[in-house]
């Protein structure tokens, strides 16, 4: 029988045929050697495989090998051998579901169900999405693969594509009906798994993914994004529902970020992160920072800056955020003590500077006390940012917000003008501009934004 092994190993087809005619069994085995059919498949020799099958080799023999001949043919990526085995009734329940595009074409041709699942309830599409095999993903979808099938862990093909940061595959799945709001067994949306990549986050949000859904641990995509995401990604995930959302341990995004980059910490503070929230152990973000043996001074400064500024709105904020209870620690670090003094001086200066004569002060602007700030955007050039090194970001942020609001309001006025004129309602059109402006100021900005987007979409159609 060894002669058959040597003939196969040296790809001597004539010798193989002669030995089989002389009565050597095509499935003969010798301990420590592959079966003849398996060895031929590993050599990717189509002729040898064909000869053995024609002479009675069993295409489903797995007595010694841990996988079937069909599985091995798929693994070595030989469509021709796969087709041969299927022609000889290879068992289609004995092969892996991660297959290449050429193999998929063969399997589909032989009538294999593209929605078949393995013991982990994963389908062909799960594996193709996980491995960013775009051609296979497209082929499977064209042949009826279920884009929303979930495996034993509740993961959909979109979850797999997103977790591997394969944006193109994710986009193809979304274009073909993949649901962005599908949850796995841990309550995670695809957005939770893709929260560290700007392109993926933007793609999922563009396709309607909610950003405020919590997983079983109470974490939003923003909680996931904090550690490894860029500032631009964080901005996509922040809104009034997520900025102070608490996980099951009462950690806000600010608790997560305190040991990370100061730039992202400041961004959360600008957008309304609450520095008074306590975690399950009763610690505010400042408490945690002050308890660390190695102090992250820039982050402590950022929270102190916010505390002294917002104290103008909430008088007992220093106590609530943990500043008073940590005063001794802060006072013993000269850099922090000096920062406290600088904050107080700068806030006093902000009280003295107005946007225009007898108008709101810069402090009013920074503490959101001015509802009609967008009316003052033309006076923004009066601000000398160099005079406010600590709070210049707060001032710029509020002014940019006001400019955005003014733009939205003006677009909405034009939109409403257009709607009313089309319907021959001249009453709105005849209203003074200031009165129209005043009315729209009280409309929810997010509602206006969605209204404008909807109108733009209809116009494109």
Curated annotation (Swiss-Prot):
> Which keywords does the record carry?
ANK repeat, Repeat
Repeat region (ANK), residues = 1-28, 31-61, 65-94, 96-116, 120-149, 153-182, 186-213, 217-248, 250-277, 281-312, 358-385, 431-460
SUPFAM superfamilies given in the database record: Ankyrin repeat
Q: Which SMART domains match?
A: ANK (SM00248)
Q: A Pfam family in this protein?
A: PRANC
Q: Does the keyword Transmembrane helix apply?
A: no
Q: Does the keyword Nucleotide-binding apply?
A: no
Stored InterPro entries: Ankyrin_rpt (IPR002110), Ankyrin_rpt-contain_sf (IPR036770), PRANC_domain (IPR018272)
The protein depicted here goes by the name Putative ankyrin repeat protein FPV218
Q: What broad taxonomic lineage does this protein's source fall under?
A: Viruses, Varidnaviria, Bamfordvirae, Nucleocytoviricota, Pokkesviricetes
């Amino acid at each position: 029988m060894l002669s058959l092994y040597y003939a196969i190993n040296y790809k001597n087809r004539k010798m193989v045929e002669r030995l089989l005619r002389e009565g050597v069994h095509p499935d003969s085995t010798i301990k420590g050697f592959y079966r003849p059919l398996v060895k031929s498949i590993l050599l990717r020799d189509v002729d040898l495989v064909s000869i053995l099958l024609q002479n009675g080799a069993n295409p489903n023999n797995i007595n010694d090998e841990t996988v079937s001949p069909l599985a091995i043919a798929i693994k070595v990526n030989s469509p021709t051998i796969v087709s041969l085995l299927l022609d000889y009734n290879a068992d289609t329940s004995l092969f892996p579901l991660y297959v290449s595009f050429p193999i998929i074409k063969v399997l589909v041709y032989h009538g294999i169900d593209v929605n078949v699942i393995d013991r982990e309830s994963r389908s062909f599409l799960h594996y193709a999405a996980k491995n960013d095999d775009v051609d296979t993903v497209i082929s499977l979808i064209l042949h009826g693969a279920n884009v929303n099938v979930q495996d034993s862990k509740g993961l959909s093909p979109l979850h797999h594509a997103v977790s591997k940061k394969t944006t193109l595959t994710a986009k193809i799945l979304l274009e073909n009906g993949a649901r962005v709001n599908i949850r796995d067994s841990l309550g995670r949306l695809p957005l939770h798994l893709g929260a560290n990549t700007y392109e993926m986050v933007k793609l999922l949000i563009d396709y309607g993914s909610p950003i405020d859904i919590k997983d079983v641990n109470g974490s939003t995509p923003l909680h996931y994004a904090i550690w490894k995401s860029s500032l631009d990604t964080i901005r996509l995930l922040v809104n009034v529902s997520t900025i102070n959302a608490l996980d099951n341990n009462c950690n806000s995004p600010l608790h997560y970020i305190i040991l990370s980059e100061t730039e992202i910490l400041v961004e959360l503070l600008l957008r309304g992160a609450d520095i008074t929230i306590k975690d399950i152990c009763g610690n505010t973000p400042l408490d945690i920072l002050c308890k660390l043996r190695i102090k992250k001074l820039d982050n402590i400064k950022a929270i102190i800056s916010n505390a002294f500024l917002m104290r103008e709105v909430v008088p007992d904020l220093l106590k609530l955020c943990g500043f008073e209870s940590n005063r001794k620690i802060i006072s013993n670090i000269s850099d922090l003590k000096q920062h406290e003094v600088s904050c107080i001086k700068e806030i006093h200066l902000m009280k003295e500077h107005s946007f225009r004569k007898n108008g709101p002060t810069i402090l009013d602007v920074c503490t959101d006390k001015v509802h009609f700030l967008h009316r003052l955007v033309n006076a923004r050039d009066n601000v000398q940012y160099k005079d406010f090194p600590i709070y210049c970001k707060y001032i710029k942020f509020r002014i940019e917000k006001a400019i955005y609001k003014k733009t939205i309001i003006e677009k909405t006025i034009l939109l409403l003008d257009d709607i009313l004129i089309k319907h021959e309602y001249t009453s709105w059109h005849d209203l003074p501009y200031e009165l129209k402006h005043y009315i729209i100021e009280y409309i929810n900005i997010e509602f206006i934004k969605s209204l404008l987007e909807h109108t733009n979409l209809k116009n494109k159609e």
